[in-house]
A protein has these predicted regions:
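Short conserved catalytic/interaction loops centered on acidic-Pro-aromatic/His motifs
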Residues: 79-82, 433-437, 477
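C-terminal substrate-recognition regions of SAM-dependent nucleic acid methyltransferases
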Residues: 164, 168, 246-473
Length: 487
């Protein structure tokens, strides 16, 4: 209910003084307080203010909180104006109005929310042959009151308010939409659906939208490429508040990549006020969200990436393999005999090179393989707030291959180059750049799009890389404060 009654700061939880509140009902009651001469006059027009404030919510617990906040808002404005608390008999009619004006409704069907009926076996009949539609069970309409009709208002079905219009109009849309639907991948490959809600909401042309959603859309998410492009290019997003660790918002829920909430305003066009919360510290900056094809959540990191990309060097997303580098799934197992060795999630074993159709050019090379899963659970940092990013990393000799469990990070003709490359991947510098894209536990070749390629005939250290890209002491400290050292 913050748009209706802004009693407290949504970020800090602190109460906001009545004079500084900006909710819809707050603004109406402020006008009443500024103009009413007597208490009776104040109560009369304050009642009209409550009567003209409407809203609906799908979830019952959210509805209860909204109703309570509106009632307390009325009481607090009365006390601020007349220096007394309202009596119970004064609050009763206001509570009645609020119970009518804030109601529970399924906005897609304009009906009382109900459980989805169990599917039944379809029985074909004569009429179905000709395309006759079977009757659908009726929905239960929601009733609201028109307080201008009758001494106590007149109840009417909500859909009649639209007066023949086929689309609803909203001042504000606020909520926490469903995040994903399972596609049989145990959550790892579930399909996001919050993007569909946002796209549908925008078609109603509301005055403002405020939704809390997973933050993985910044750089990943199944099927979110078009959505990400549209969001990053949308200059109507006035505010974006980002929590790197979802446990800061939902103490019992790990949301891979963190969560965020944004405010979209139809009347706004400009840079976005972006705030990131990490380890209890807030960082705020006004930013163009589409600086890169993916969104970098940390402003300092954004400046580091700009420096790294200045020279236009080849990046490792052109070097790292795709999934199944040798065409073998995670379930691939060794054979009884073979002329090469398979590295799989259960160890090592023989395999026949004649069975390999993909990546054959790498079989005779020295290869660095890394696990497709990051070292972090659900993308969350360790207790010290630092990230390791890369977990398993191994050197495969010629005639050694791997299953889909791993990515081939690079393949070389000499052991020296491969070893230098492995040391490069272990630097805090490289793993920091990977982290800016790999926000969840899944790694792909795209996760390496910010990592520049080097001359691997020599060894690289963090000190050399910091100097090469002219990073300031503040930027170096920032990287070292975020990324664990790796032996």
């Amino acid at each position: 209910a913050p748009f209706l009654a802004s009693r407290y700061d949504a970020a800090t939880g602190e109460m906001i003084p009545v004079a500084r509140r900006i909710g819809i009902l707050d603004r109406k009651l402020r006008v009443v307080s500024e103009n009413a001469v007597t208490e009776d006059e104040w109560r009369k027009y304050a009642t009209h203010a409550v009567q003209s404030t409407y809203g609906y919510e799908y979830q019952g617990d959210n509805l209860l909180l909204a109703r309570v906040n509106l009632l307390l808002t009325y009481a607090e404005h009365l006390q601020a104006r007349w220096q007394r608390k309202p009596a119970k008999e004064e609050l009763q009619p206001i509570a009645n109005i609020i119970s009518w004006n804030l109601w529970q409704m399924d906005g897609l069907h304009l009906s009382v929310p109900g459980g989805k009926p169990q599917p039944e076996a379809e029985q074909l009949d004569l009429f179905s042959i000709f395309g006759a539609a079977e009757p659908q069970p009726p929905t239960v309409s929601c009733k609201v009151k028109n307080w201008r009709k009758g001494s106590h208002g007149t109840a009417q079905n909500f859909e009649t308010i639209q007066e023949g219009s086929t689309s609803m109009k909203f001042d504000y849309v606020i909520g926490n939409p469903p995040y994903q639907i399972s596609d049989g991948g145990a959550g790892v490959s579930a399909t996001p659906i919050y993007n569909r809600f946002i796209e549908a909401i925008k078609t109603t042309h509301p005055g403002a939208i405020c939704l809390i959603i997973p933050a993985k859309w910044y750089s990943g998410g199944k099927g979110l490429d078009k959505f990400r492009e549209e969001m990053l290019g949308d200059r109507h997003i006035s505010t974006l508040v980002d929590y790197s660790n979802s446990l800061d918002v939902f103490p019992n829920v790990d949301v891979a990549g963190g969560v965020c909430y944004f405010v979209w305003k139809e009347a706004y066009n400009g840079k976005c006020k972006y705030t990131n919360y990490r380890n209890g510290k807030a960082t705020t900056a006004y930013r163009d969200l589409n600086e890169f094809q993916t969104f970098i959540r940390y402003p300092v990191a954004s400046e580091i990436v700009k420096k790294v990309k200045e020279d236009g060097e080849l990046t490792l997303d052109k070097v790292v393999s795709s999934r199944k580098p040798f065409g073998l799934a995670t379930t691939a197992k060794p054979m009884k005999t073979g002329d090469i060795t398979l590295r799989y999630n259960g160890g090592r074993g023989p395999y026949k090179s004649t069975e390999i159709r993909v990546g054959t050019e790498m079989i005779d090379q020295w290869k660095i393989i890394i696990s497709r899963l990051t070292a972090e659970h659900a993308g969350q940092p360790a207790k010290d707030g630092k990230y390791r990013v890369l977990s398993t990393m191994e050197l495969l000799k010629p005639d050694e291959i791997c299953s889909e469990t791993y990515l081939v990070a690079g393949a070389f003709d000499s052991k020296e180059e491969a070893t230098n490359y492995m040391d490069y991947l272990k630097t805090q510098f490289v793993r920091f750049l990977i982290l800016q894209i790999a926000m969840t536990q899944q790694l792909s070749k795209a996760s390496f799009a910010f990592v520049p390629c080097q001359d691997f005939s020599r060894k690289w250290t963090d000190k050399q890389l910091f100097e090469k890209y002219d990073l300031s002491s503040e930027e170096v400290n920032y990287i070292q404060g975020m990324i664990k050292e790796m032996a």
